[in-house]
Amino acid sequence: MSVGNLHNWYSSAGCEIEVGRTGQISDQQDGLRWPAFYRVQDNQAAKGLWLGAKNFYDPVVDKEYEHKVVHAGPRHLDIVGETIPIELTMYGRYDHPNVFVDGDPSTNLQYLDEVDFVNPDLISDRKIYNEVQTSMGVKMKRTIYSFAHPEHQNYHIQEYVFINNGCFDKECEIEYQQAIEGFQVYLQYRYAISREGMIYDGNWLPQSAAWGHNTMNDVIGEYPNNPSSNDQFYDDGEIIRGLFSWHGYHSSADPPENLGGPDFGGDGHLGAAQFVGVTTLHADTSPSDNSNDINQPTTTWFITSDDPTTSGNQQYNGTKSTKEYVNYMTVGHPEQSHAEIVGTGNANQFNDPRTGSNPGGTSQGIGFGPYDLEPGDSIRIVLAEGASGLSLSLIHI
């Protein structure tokens, strides 16, 4: 999706996993490009989408699980038997212009905006519709909107609808209708800001910054009924429920004043002045009540990016699923956010209070639920993911 000043790739499996587009380690940072009019402005390293439930019967293996979790990312992906792509279609209000020189495309950007269908009545300049069947009897419909308007070109709106359809494979040859108890939606965001100064490009920032080792993550609005001093509010008084991340201090930076990623060995311009993040626009209160529940998300704990649960996921391992569901997906809110704990210290030296280590940096998680879904029930969650920061003229002062 590459209109406006924020570009990102989207996967047919429903989530953008680590090196999931090209498979190349040099593309550790790939996506969420802002400002996208300039090269190597990627801020995204990996994402994860986990769906969980409790007291769940799985007809595929004829087994009752205390907890069942299916995964797409941040590393694991099974598109045959877990998160199964059904559709990925790009709609455009208009197609992109075609620019040729002597019969050849003038730029590789020609291939980054492939519109499948043109609809001049779209509310956005681009829309991606993505449908995924999961192996827990839930279908996900994901719709992503992007805009080219100067005041709306730095965010994408992402709408998720989860439907208890009872299907466990692509063709619904395995079908079992049941009430789904404690349905939880859990997303992980691993940001690395930004690619310009990292090892595979400008190479003036510490190597591990390329996988987000020094990324700082903060959360606001987690207690709407008891706001804190740093919470923010919309013009109508509603609290903003969001997470945001930036390039923090790194112990190997030389000199150590590396906020903004200055190119000290070159012209001194800032190569990591972006802030990126996600805000919750809407989360259904229940399948029967579509009003916006301001107490969602119910989980805002951070997770270290190399935590054992971020790889080797197994949907039929009940012990692992229980650990994921209880210790990560539904764990609630920490007393302090990751950024509050790190403070003015080096973010790459932060140790997770739960695991005692942190070799790969820290990701931010948000969890929605729990919901109880009867057969045919659905719930809807709407997020906005965006990026902003200093303008090009300011980072070169």
Predicted features, each with a name:
Residues 1-394:
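A long-range scaffold signal marking pre-active-site subdomains of enzyme folds
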